[in-house]
Amino acid sequence: MKRIFFMAIAVLALAACSNNTDEVLKEKVESYAVVEVKSPLYDALSENDKKIVSLFRQAGEIMDGLFWKQTFGDKAEMEALTNEYEKAYAMINYGPWDHLDNNAPFVEGYGEKPLGCQYYPQDMTMEEWNAFEDPNKLSLYTVVRRDENGALKTVWYREEYKEELEKVCALLEESASLTENEGMRTYLTERVKAFRTDDYLASDLAWMDMKDCNMDLVIGPIENYDDHLFEAKAAYECFILLKDEKRSANLAKYVGLLPTLQTMLPCAPEYKTFVPGTSSDLNVYDAIFYAGDCNGGSKTIAINLPNDERVHAAKGTRRLQLYNSMMAKFDKIMAPIGEVLVTPEQQKYLTADAFFWNVTFHEVAHGLGVKQTVNGKGTVDEAMGSEKTTWEEAKADILGLFMVSSLIDMGEITDITKEESIATFIAGIVRSVRFGFASSHGKANMMCYNYMEKNGAFSRNEEGKWVIDFEKAAECINSWANLIIETQATGNVEFAKAYSAENASIGEALAADIEKINGAGIPRDIVFDFAW
């Protein structure tokens, strides 16, 4: 985004509203705290590395345009809006639908957001889909279109977005020619091949082999959260990251503990036979650029990739903790929420360090657990269908907290207490719930909140403040984790659907809490001004 956009937001914040609609939109725009993105790690780069990062940014801006096409269509429609608040909020949301309000439309003339965005024909019926026998129709890297006779057909991303992808390939090829890091050069070369073939395995493996580079580039069609119809299509995005060598070194020892942590999971032995790869990375970065899917609505503060289970088995995963983004969210959102909700006596347990550890092991938890069902239903993802991402996020939430608590008991994490980890986690649930239920993350957090409340992990005192029962919270961690893993291991999608339908909702007490938070003017999320 251009800096002028953020200047416009500042002007809008001071402008008088002409009507109630403008007032509501003004509040929506201001619900995102503007964060200037910069890093001392960027200042320390060589001139050659700065050239490479500039090329990465150009490639990322193309990813941004491609995501607009995927999630909405023609960005020019939103750029042409005459209401400045509508336009500003549309730029944040990549369209006229509010990410933090279950994708409710906020621009007149637009109805509900299509579940399949632009990945499928808007007029496609389920009867057509079920009769459509193309083996590639559920590929991450195809769109579904109509042929000249009106019949459904698949089109590979490399064909649908060929013009833009060739520009990206040229930029990555130039970057590869400039880098002095062999691992980065190999990764970029393989990523170019991936964009041209829609086969990302080799580039994902090369990315995992890239261990000693001071920067990282996450680019391509990656997550499938944007496809609410089948969760089958990958959305384009880009992160440009600079490695924090000191903080990363402090995390290195935990990679070797992953197999041990897997055996410690609070579930039946037959559900934890998967052995995670030990080539996994666990590193800390400053994020200096977001584009596309990751930049829409609520912002990612940690990454766990690749998603390909073949890579998990062979190489593990890379967990990237985005420290500057994480601290921005803690300072502007988490800490103020804790002051509003948690009893004063327990506010001392809300710490930035605990937030860091909880988020870090949320990402680690994605790589653990069960990958194949135990009853012949195939992979967990296949068996869980439309529930897969909600339950995967729920698993990562609670297993992350389980692992932090376990590592504290083992003496491996020494700078926080279990009380800090648990209290910060519980307050953090509300931060995430405010993302709305348009996201799998929001649904997962709501299920966790309701489970912990019903089982006594916390209650409200006479003043309406939260009082955490740390003993009961510890019991909830184990029992909730066990329920999730068992559901995934057995591929019990019918139970998963029924459970999420009943429990991914906001009750009266939490609704009142959220009103308190909103009344205090606490931002719901952040929006970036890339100041470099």
Task: Please describe what each predicted stretch is.
Residues 370-394:
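Post-HEXXH active-site segment of zinc metalloproteases
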Residues 46, 181, 389-406:
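An active-site-proximal "capping" alpha-helix that borders the catalytic cofactor pocket
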Residues 485-532:
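Extended, compositionally biased alpha-helical segments that mediate assembly or anchoring
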Residues 22-187:
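N-terminal helix-rich structural modules
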Residues 401-498:
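Long, well-structured alpha-helical subdomains associated
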Residues 14-16:
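C-terminal motif of bacterial Sec signal peptides marking the signal peptidase cleavage site
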Residues 157-347, 351:
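Contiguous, non-catalytic segments that form substrate-binding/exosite surfaces or channel walls
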Residues 46, 357-371, 396, 401:
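Active-site recognition of the HExxH zinc-binding catalytic motif
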